[in-house]
């Protein structure tokens, strides 16, 4: 069981410009969702999170269910892993509907805590 100390206050992204700003940050892809992360360079500010579910992933009932599952996963287990001064946008994928909830929370925690591996530079840019 988690205590109040384990849960960190997580703010919300609400306006379109806030969501668009996060797109300039790094992306962390996964089978259940895409996580976009932006460092606001504000270590005193709270972490903020926004949720996106596009219309191509189902009707309103299914989209709302995906959004509710993501919100609950952040509330229960992933909020503590979010770094202060960072913005997070979670873009749901269709497989999120049928995934077990514990797999969802585990994947979310892993994506938040682990930075993506560095991509190799293009072949022409290497020094010999």
UniProtKB/Swiss-Prot annotation:
Q: What is its EC number?
A: 3.1.26.5
What's the catalysed reaction?
Answer: Endonucleolytic cleavage of RNA, removing 5'-extranucleotides from tRNA precursor
Q: Which key words tag this protein in UniProt?
A: Endonuclease, Hydrolase, Nuclease, RNA-binding, tRNA processing
The portions of this protein that span the membrane are none
- Alphabetized SUPFAM superfamilies for the sequence: Ribosomal protein S5 domain 2-like
Record GO terms (molecular function): 3'-tRNA processing endoribonuclease activity; ribonuclease P activity; tRNA binding
Q: Name one GO cellular component term.
A: ribonuclease P complex
| Protein task | RNaseP catalyzes the removal of the 5'-leader sequence from pre-tRNA to produce the mature 5'-terminus. It can also cleave other RNA substrates such as 4.5S RNA. The protein component plays an auxiliary but essential role in vivo by binding to the 5'-leader sequence and broadening the substrate specificity of the ribozyme.
Family designation: Belongs to the RnpA family.
NCBIfam families this protein is in?
rnpA
Assembly notes: Consists of a catalytic RNA component (M1 or rnpB) and a protein subunit.
Q: What is this protein called?
A: Ribonuclease P protein component
Q: Which organism is it from?
A: Rhizobium meliloti (strain 1021) (Ensifer meliloti)
Organism ancestry: Bacteria, Pseudomonadati, Pseudomonadota, Alphaproteobacteria, Hyphomicrobiales
């Amino acid at each position: 069981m988690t205590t109040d100390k384990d849960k960190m206050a997580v703010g919300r992204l609400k306006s379109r410009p806030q969501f668009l700003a996060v797109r300039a940050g790094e992306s962390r892809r996964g089978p259940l969702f895409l996580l976009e992360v932006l460092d606001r360079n504000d270590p005193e500010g709270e972490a903020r999170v926004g949720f996106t579910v596009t219309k191509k992933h189902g009707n309103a009932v299914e989209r709302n269910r995906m959004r509710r599952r993501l919100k609950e996963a952040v509330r229960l287990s992933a909020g503590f892993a979010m770094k202060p001064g960072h913005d997070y946008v979670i873009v749901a994928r269709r497989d999120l509907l049928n995934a077990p909830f514990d797999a969802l929370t585990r994947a979310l925690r892993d994506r938040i805590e682990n930075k993506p591996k560095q991509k190799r530079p293009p072949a022409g840019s290497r020094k010999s």
